[in-house]
Amino acid sequence: MKLSFLSLVLAIILVMALMYTPHAEAKAWADADADATAAADADADAVADALADAVAKIKIPWGKVKDFLVGGMKAVGKK
């Protein structure tokens, strides 16, 4: 059975495609994983920055807290 030139070219293309496809798929998965990791890191950094800003804005009136605690201690009989 003789192969025509076109059949030979198609066979070579098929073999090359079969050899290259797993490599391309693995590379695509690796790139997607790296992109997902980078996006998750960016989200975590944004949340941490927002939380730090929120905590920095909280003003605790320590004098009132102390008065409340001292008053509570006196109410139960402790100095």
From Swiss-Prot:
Keyword Signal (UniProt): yes
Coiled-coil residues: none
Protein purpose: Antimicrobial peptide that shows antimicrobial activities against all microorganisms tested with minimal inhibitory concentrations (MICs) values ranging from 0.45 to 97.5 umol/L. This peptide kills the microorganisms by permeabilizating the membranes. It shows a very weak hemolytic activity (HC(50)=325 umol/L) and weak cytotoxicity against human lymphocytes (LC(50)=67.8 umol/L). Gram-negative bacteria tested are E.coli (MIC=24.4 umol/L), C.sakazakii (MIC=5.8 umol/L), P.aeruginosa (MIC=8.7-12.2 umol/L), S.enterica (MIC=5.4 umol/L), and H.pylori (MIC=0.99-3.9 umol/L).
Subcellular location: Secreted; Target cell membrane
GO biological process: defense response to bacterium
Family from the record: Belongs to the formicidae venom precursor-01 superfamily.
GO cellular component: extracellular region; membrane; other organism cell membrane
Protein source organism: Tetramorium bicarinatum
Pfam family, one: Pilosulin
Post-translational modification: The C-terminal amidation is important for antimicrobial activity, since a non-amidated synthetic peptide shows a reduced antimicrobial activity (2-20-fold depending on the strain tested). The amidation may play a positive role in the peptide conformation, since amidated peptide shows an increase of about 5% of helical content.
Propeptide feature: residues: 27-56
Signal peptide: 1-26
InterPro entries the record matches: Pilosulin (IPR049518)
UniProtKB keywords: Amidation, Antibiotic, Antimicrobial, Membrane, Secreted, Signal, Target cell membrane, Target membrane
Protein's UniProt name: M-myrmicitoxin(01)-Tb1a
Keyword Phosphoprotein attributed: no
Tissue expression summary: Expressed by the venom gland.
